[in-house]
Amino acid sequence: MIGIFHIFMWYFLLVLYMGQIKGAFGTYEPVTYKTGCTLWGIFFIIAGVFLIRVTKYPTRSGIISTLIINIICIITTITAVTLTIIELSHFNSVSYRNYGQAKLGREVSRILLFFYGLEFSIALTHSIYSCSNLFRRQNDLTSVTEEAESTP
């Protein structure tokens, strides 16, 4: 759900920044827009799909792949937060015609900053539980093997 929200926010920013008029001070094109930062929501969607699949069909390889995609989501989120903070800390002059669009774009970045934190906490929590589940499954397999070897 959060990933779909990020994709819609990217589309909103695309429409918003495409409507800018070239003025004396130029247009506002933040670094998060240039890098397609909100398009990285695709990683969050993929992580959700993997999570649902592992919940229905828990296999070791599924848990490992979900753990890997969640780690990718964590790295993506940290990168997105860093780029958004850099964007929000610097505001160059723009044409007065584009000021409203730039201001609205910065507000969208602030909203996304909150959702990046939410996605980070979800991915981190699920990664921790995946690691503990893998460790527990490995211990269960070891104990079953030891029991089989100890019976004559």
Swiss-Prot record:
Predominant location category: membrane
Transmembrane segments: 1-21, 32-52, 66-86, 111-131
GO biological process: cell surface receptor signaling pathway
InterPro entries: CD20-like (IPR007237), MS4A (IPR030417)
Pfam families: CD20 (PF04103)
Keyword field: Membrane, Transmembrane, Transmembrane helix
Membrane topology summary: Multi-pass membrane protein
Residues forming coiled coils: none
Subcellular location, record wording: Membrane
Family: Belongs to the MS4A family.
Function: May be involved in signal transduction as a component of a multimeric receptor complex.
Protein name per the record: Membrane-spanning 4-domains subfamily A member 13
Organism (species): Homo sapiens (Human)
Lineage: Eukaryota, Metazoa, Chordata, Craniata, Vertebrata
Gene: MS4A13
